[in-house]
Design a protein with these regions (language model features):
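RNase H-like nuclease fold core
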Residues: 1-47, 55-62, 66
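Hydrophobic (often cysteine-bearing) scaffold residues that line and stabilize catalytic clefts
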Residues: 48-49, 118
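RNase H catalytic domain
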Residues: 11-15, 54-126, 130-132
Length: 132
């Protein structure tokens, strides 16, 4: 297996409020290899989105592939990763750096903004952490 795909989604009830994350780690053919579903404590939606991406990529690293594609419905995280958006909130900068360090372990990486409907599995996993 040379490519692994991570669908990641963060949720926040209240913004700020209790955060949850979900990630689905899949083969290029769409076979789910593993999942992440967890509560993160109090924070914002953007913190949750970064938390989901970081947790998903950490899990994906276990599979030892050469390439990763991160798919998220958070336009902010995607555009900050690609350098299209600057970071205005100081609390997001270390998370961006951590995420870049993690995906930098791959020979090739990409990040894609997907519609919410395409990220449904990760959303389900985030809601599962809330007990829904």
């Amino acid at each position: 297996m040379s490519l692994i795909i991570v669908y990641a989604d963060g949720a926040c009830r209240g913004n700020p409020g209790p955060m949850a994350i979900g990630a689905s780690i899949q083969t290029a053919e769409g076979v789910e290899l593993s999942t992440v579903s967890a509560l993160l404590g109090q924070g914002t939606n953007n913190l949750a989105e970064y938390g989901a991406a970081i947790a998903g990529v950490r899990k994906a690293i276990e599979y030892g592939t050469d390439a990763i594609e991160l798919r998220m419905d958070s336009q902010l995280v995607v555009k900050q990763l690609t350098g299209e958006f600057q970071i205005r909130k100081a609390d997001l900068k270390p998370l961006l750096n951590e995420l870049l360090t993690l995906i930098g372990q791959y020979k090739a990486w990409s990040v894609t903004h997907v519609r919410r409907e395409q990220n449904q599995r990760a959303d389900e996993l985030a809601n599962l952490a809330y007990g829904y």
